[in-house]
Amino acid sequence: MIVARRYVIGGRVQRVGFRYFTEAAAAREGVLGWVRNMPDGRVEVVAEGDAEAVERFERSLRHGPPHARVERVDVDDMVPTGRETGFIIK
């Protein structure tokens, strides 16, 4: 089953390689979508893919790269669009 989710990650998640870590996790799991820094210091991610792959991807987001400190992850389910063709850093 294909699912789509939006994540907003808070904590020490900018200037620690979080977007590149997220891009690598998406490639590893075959997840499509994008990641971007938000002006308020959080990171936003939209992910679409197989439900099990998105769950594994989410576990990676909750852990983060070595220098990050993930304090909060807000998750919203979305309707999969099928429009994503890869995973990009915005």
Segment roles from a protein language model:
Residues 1-90:
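Intrinsically disordered, low-complexity, mixed-charge
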